[in-house]
C-alpha cells in the first residue's frame, strides 16, 4: 500500500507531468513568446474617432463663405415671371446644397443654428464680417483713423448724445477699428465690444421708446426723490420686474441709462449685478414688444438676424 502511494507521488513530481500555461499554444515552450501573437489577457484601449465640428476655419475655407460670395449671384436665379415661393425655393436650395457640401453631418436647420452661433461668438468670423462691411463701403483703416477713434473715445457721454446722424458714420468706423484692436489683444469676454450688435440694440430700444411716447431724453431728465428710487431698486432686487407700473419702469430705465456709462471700477459689486439684471429685463421687454418688426410674420425657429439688418441700416445700406 505504501509502495503504491510512493509511486503516485513520484509520478506527480515528474517534470513531464507539470501543467503548461493555457495561453501558450500546444507544442511551444512557455519561456519563448512569439512577438507576433497578441496577448489575449492584455486590455487594449479603443481609440475614439475625432469628431468633426463646424469651426471658423471650415467656414472660411474655399468651400465656405468665400464660395457663397463668389457663386451666389451666379447660381441664384430670381425671376419676375415666377412667384415668390419659387424664387425663395431657389435661394434655399442653393444654401442647402452648399451646407451639405461643407458639413454633411448636420441637417440644414441644425447647420443654420450652428452658423448663427459661431458667427456671433468666434472672434475670427466677427472680424471677417466687419471686413465685409468695410470693403462694401470702401473704408480704409490707417494709423490716422485709429488715432481719430481714440480721440472720439475720450469724448464725454454728453457730446456723444448730441452727435448728428451724419457724423455717426465715422464713429461706427472707428468703433470697428477698436474691435480690431480688441481681437489683437485677445479679449473676447465682453460681447458689448461688438459694435454691430451694440448699435442695433440701441436702435431697437429707441423704436420701442418712441412707441411708448417717451425718448431717452425724457428718461434721463426724470429726477425722482432718492428715497423712492432706493425703495424701487430694493423692490426690483427682491422680486424683479413683476408687478411694476409703467412710471416705475421709466424710473428704472432712467437709473440704468445714468449708470450704464459709468466705469465698473467706481461701482459696487451689488450695483454691477443690478445693472446686469436691469439690462437683461430691458432686453426681454424689448424683444416681447418688438416682434412685429420681424420681416417674416410668424417666423421660423431661427428668426431673422435683426441685429445684422439694423447694423447695415446704421452704416447706410
UniProtKB/Swiss-Prot annotation:
Report the Pfam families cross-referenced here.
Swi3 (PF07962)
As for subcellular location, the record says:
Nucleus
Q: Where is this chain primarily localised? A: nucleus
- Does the record bear Thylakoid in its keywords? no
Ordered alphabetically, the record's keywords are: Cell cycle, DNA damage, DNA repair, DNA replication inhibitor, Meiosis, Nucleus
A cellular component term, taken from the record's GO annotations = nuclear replication fork
Q: GO MF terms on file?
A: DNA binding
Q: What is this protein called?
A: Chromosome segregation in meiosis protein 3
What is the originating organism of this protein?
Saccharomyces cerevisiae (strain ATCC 204508 / S288c)
Gene that specifies this protein: CSM3
Amino acid at each position: 500500500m505504501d509502495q503504491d502511494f510512493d509511486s503516485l507521488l513520484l509520478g506527480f513530481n515528474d517534470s513531464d507531468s507539470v501543467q503548461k500555461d493555457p495561453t501558450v499554444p500546444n507544442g511551444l515552450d512557455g519561456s519563448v513568446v512569439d512577438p507576433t501573437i497578441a496577448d489575449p489577457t492584455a486590455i487594449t484601449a479603443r481609440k475614439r474617432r475625432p469628431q468633426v465640428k463646424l469651426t471658423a476655419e471650415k467656414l472660411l475655407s474655399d468651400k465656405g463663405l468665400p464660395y457663397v460670395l463668389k457663386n451666389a449671384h451666379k447660381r441664384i436665379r430670381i425671376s419676375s415671371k415666377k412667384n415668390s415661393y419659387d424664387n425663395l425655393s431657389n435661394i434655399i436650395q442653393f444654401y442647402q446644397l452648399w451646407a451639405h457640401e461643407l458639413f454633411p453631418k448636420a441637417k440644414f436647420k441644425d447647420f443654420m443654428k450652428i452658423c448663427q452661433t459661431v458667427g456671433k461668438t468666434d472672434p475670427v468670423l466677427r472680424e471677417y464680417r466687419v471686413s465685409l462691411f468695410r470693403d462694401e463701403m470702401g473704408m480704409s483703416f490707417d494709423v490716422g483713423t485709429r488715432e481719430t477713434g481714440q480721440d472720439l473715445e475720450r469724448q464725454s457721454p454728453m457730446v456723444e448724445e448730441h452727435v448728428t446722424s451724419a457724423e455717426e458714420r465715422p464713429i461706427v468706423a472707428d468703433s470697428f477699428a477698436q474691435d480690431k484692436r480688441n481681437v489683437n489683444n485677445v479679449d473676447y469676454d465682453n460681447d458689448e465690444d461688438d459694435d454691430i450688435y451694440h448699435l442695433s440694440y440701441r436702435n431697437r430700444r429707441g423704436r420701442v421708446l418712441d412707441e411708448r411716447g417717451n425718448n431717452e431724453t425724457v428718461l434721463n431728465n426724470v429726477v425722482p426723490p432718492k428715497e423712492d428710487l432706493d425703495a424701487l431698486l430694493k423692490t426690483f432686487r427682491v422680486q424683479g420686474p413683476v408687478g411694476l407700473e409703467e412710471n416705475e419702469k421709466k424710473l428704472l430705465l432712467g437709473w440704468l441709462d445714468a449708470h450704464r456709462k459709468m466705469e465698473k471700477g467706481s461701482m459696487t459689486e451689488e450695483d454691477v449685478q443690478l445693472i446686469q439684471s436691469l439690462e437683461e429685463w430691458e432686453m426681454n421687454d424689448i424683444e416681447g414688444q418688438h416682434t412685429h418688426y420681424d420681416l417674416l410674420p410668424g417666423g421660423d425657429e431661427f428668426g431673422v438676424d435683426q441685429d445684422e439688418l439694423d447694423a447695415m441700416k446704421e452704416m447706410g445700406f
